[in-house]
Amino acid sequence: MFCVQCEQTIRTPAGNGCSYAQGMCGKTAETSDLQDLLIAALQGLSAWAVKAREYGIINHDVDSFAPRAFFSTLTNVNFDSPRIVGYAREAIALREALKAQCLAVDANARVDNPMANLQLVSDDLGELQRQAAEFTPNKDKAAIGENILGLRLLCLYGLKGAAAYMEHAHVLGQYDNDIYAQYHKIMAWLGTWPADMNALLECSMEIGQMNFKVMSILDAGETGKYGHPTPTQVNVKATAGKCILISGHDLKDLYNLLEQTEGTGVNVYTHGEMLPAHGYPELRKFKHLVGNYGSGWQNQQVEFARFPGPIVMTSNCIIDPTVGAYDDRIWTRSIVGWPGVRHLDGDDFSAVITQAQQMAGFPYSEIPHLITVGFGRQTLLGAADTLIDLVSREKLRHIFLLGGCDGARGERHYFTDFATSVPDDCLILTLACGKYRFNKLEFGDIEGLPRLVDAGQCNDAYSAIILAVTLAEKLGCGVNDLPLSMVLSWFEQKAIVILLTLLSLGVKNIVTGPTAPGFLTPDLLAVLNEKFGLRSITTVEEDMKQLLSA
């Protein structure tokens, strides 16, 4: 096992990365190794998808499957080894079918890629794990060095984050052939074990630029189906009655669940990154969408144990449900998996609803505590002139984009302290689950404009980018000249690709934490600092002083 993709990876003087019987996320060495094997199979599939496009062959089954299966290897998504192997077998079957299509057009069709003809050696998981050793990401570290390995992983993990957003967009009916062609090209190239530093740096920027387009179509899918988010108050306390909790990012799953629970007497609560759903008109119209439950994903083993109903996980993040003994009432959807947990293959939630009706639910309603969400792209753009007016009248000094992933590390209290230290004449724009560090606190307003503005999920960084570009255009300056600073927390690969997106668009002087990614060497961090001004957090006092004086 070797995995260094998330923020909680093991860090020692001898090197970084989880390389024991189990990773810090709870992933076993077996599952981790089989995910490496799956990635190799997907790289071979992408190699043939690139070749097929040369012949004008576009296989939509391949295009929809490839990012989805890649998504299953993202942190805290799928811990079920047999399902990972199933994805690998499906990847190889699709590759062979695509290869046959190419050969039907050109009998001499060939692909020069080490993954292009990969076959699984056995049905036995142990044998497959031994085969996977051939594809361990750091297998040639001694030959290439840590810097090249780090750049490879930056690209691989960034592309994995983009693949997750591609799947979210695909579920909503969004497809862009150029994006998929670019994805396959990069994925196939990474399967050749590239070792050119400049090429890898260029690739990382290409991934960021591609992801900006992905976020654009995801935004179109969400707003096209469910309307543009508008500011909405959400109760974060319990309401009496039967209940279901839904977590993850998939708004379509939430919509289907709301439709199927309507009139059943079962209330629905969002959790984690599903909180922004309350801002969408077509979702909040369901009166039994009664609120949001819990805090950051890392607290789920305590909070889910206390929730008196079933739980549905639609995407990341899931962690061991046996710890809180709720594994008999947590359900997985789509690419999510945990051994022994029931999985929903389709859109039918009837079994979950039946379980909810059989459980006690909340016995009484708590005193409501309302927070505000729903500052989507349209709302943000509508406030652009107000923001400019406040700045011109010196009522608004600075905007801090304070968001990203949450996690268990104690140093993450920095982000709570930073938020509470932001001066009263400054505004906090937040997104993603890092907001749970401070989104239930009171921040007041500036002439009626809330000082805490929740823009949505992690992918809604797109809205923040569009707002920044709009403000810069209206003020006749560059984005980096705005009174705007980005202080971002990271945990997994979606955060990595958001960072690459911002860097590829030329955004500079981003501050990140709580730690630097374990796969980035001091040399690589120095390069990113020199090129983009990217740096790690220090203390709240020092960072606040520096950012306000910039």
Curated annotation (Swiss-Prot):
Entry keywords, A to Z: 2Fe-2S, Cytoplasm, Iron, Iron-sulfur, Metal-binding, Oxidoreductase
Catalytic reaction(s) noted: A + NH4(+) + H2O = hydroxylamine + AH2 + H(+)
One Pfam family matching this protein: Prismane
Residues holding [2Fe-2S] cluster: 3, 6, 18, 25
Protein EC: 1.7.99.1
Presence of keyword Metal-binding: yes
Main location: cytoplasm
Biological role: Catalyzes the reduction of hydroxylamine to form NH(3) and H(2)O.
UniProt-recorded name of the protein: Hydroxylamine reductase
UniProt source species: Escherichia coli (strain SE11)
